[in-house]
Amino acid sequence: MSNIGKAIDRFTGKPVEGGAANIPGSPAQKRFEYEDQIVSRRYEAQKQIQSMHQPKLYSDRELRRLRFIYSKNHKEELRQPFRDLRNKITLNHATKGGTVLVTSVVPDYSTDIFCRNLAATIAQDESCTSLLINCKQEKDRLDVTDEPQVKGLTDYISNEDLLVSDVIHPTGISRMRVIPFGSTNDNSMDFLRSTRMRVLVKDVSHRYRERYTVINAPSVNMASDVELLNEYANQIILTIPYGKATERDIARAIKRFDKEKFLGAALIDIVPLTGILSKIF
């Protein structure tokens, strides 16, 4: 086990395991009924999802520019960690969707790439949809429409005339939607504690049972209000940019969240030309 794995184990009290999905043990009959419920629900959801509006799909060139991992350009070893993580998320909340909070130990744009690939991988399951909420400005913003300025999170927070539906936009990935950060250049994180923020997160988290929401939050050790989102999340993932965080940084970050919601940590390394390498602890 690596030093990072040992640190996570020590501060969470949970054994660190490599990317496979963890399914809680239960009597055989209850497990059978649970799986039958999942299959039934996903079949129903798949029929409903087929009617979702999809204005365009990203070209291979756009996928490369935005650092998406996709089958034509990436090896299986790059895609599998995200599939394993998707399985853990969807199996833990298979019948009612879920909200995943993703935050980094230290500020780094690799978390943006991780979040968009996690949301895209969830959406690859035809019985699921994903919604990415960007709570910080991205280095490379997703092209969501042909309009130069689209309404986003901070616009919704500051304008009470806007509805939640006004800031949810399709992406070039089937079944994946995004709420961009917004048009403001204000880097203040004060909006995280606003009533409008609470309303938005509750709305998108409970409206559709087949939707999985990924919240791309600021670094937990830099923005104190990030932990306010803890109450909305079913699961929490901590990203660790390769070579940029100490064991002390990791321990301090983990202590700020509910241990029961802590899904794991992802060690991320951005590789030129090929994209993103992730190891899930």
Q: Where are the language model's segments positioned?
A:
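P-loop/Walker-type NTP enzyme "switch/lid" segment
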Residues: 56-83, 87, 94, 105-109, ...
